[in-house]
Amino acid sequence: MHAVFFDLFETLITEFENNQRKATYSIKDLGIDEKLYKKEWAARRGRRMDGSFPDHQSVLRDIVKTCGKPINESVIESIHQERIKAKSVPFKNQDSEIMNMLQTLKDQKIKIGLISNCTAEEVEGWKESIFADLFDDVVFSYKIKRAKPHSEIYLTACDHLKVSPKNSIFVGDGGSNELQGAVAVGMKAYQATWFQPSFISEEIFGFPKLQKPMQVVDLVK
C-alpha cells in the first residue's frame, strides 16, 4: 500500500466524551424553536458539506429567513464565533494511540491523507492542531464542492498524493456511506470503531472493523 486516507470526525478526533458532546453552543438568540432549528439545519446538511453555502453565517441567515424571523447580523456573528470555539475543542488533547499510529505510518514512508466532509468553521482547529504536520494532504469537502460518498472527492485525494485508489486504504467510522464510496473507486475500506459505542458500529456491515488505531499499521505491511 502506498497511502492511507482517513476520515476526520469520530475517526481521528471525537466530539464526544462520556456520551455527551465535549463542547456545545446556543442558538437561542435567533429566536427560533430549537426543534425547528435542528430540522432546518439537518435539511441543509448536503449543501453545507459541498460548499453550496459559502459559510456558516449564510446558513444561519437562510434558516432565519425561512422561519420568518428578522436577521440580526450581530447575533449571527456571535453564534458563529461560539460554534468555531465549540468545534475547535475536539482538536485538543489527542488520543496517544492515534498519534503513535500516524507517526509510525510516517516513519514507514506511507503517504497520509485526509478526506473529510466538513464546513469551514468545523475545521478551523485543524491548522493549529498536532495533525497538520503529519498529513501529506487534506481534502475538505466544502473546498472542492464534493462530499463523500461522491467518487470525485476520493479521486481528488488520490490525485493530490499521486497514488492509485487500488494502492490506497481508506479508514473511517462509516458515516455518510463513506466506506461504500471508497470501495466504489477501488480503495480498500476499513471501519474505525475505536470511538464508537457498539450499538452504532454494529449498524454498518460489510467492512472489516478496526478496534484499535495501531491495527492500521498492520494493514500496510
Residue ranges, per PLM feature:
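Asp-based, Mg2+/Mn2+-dependent phosphohydrolase catalytic module
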Residues: M1-V4, N93, M99, Q103-K106, ...
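N-terminal helical cap/lid subdomain that shapes the substrate entry/recognition surface
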Residues: M1-N100, D107
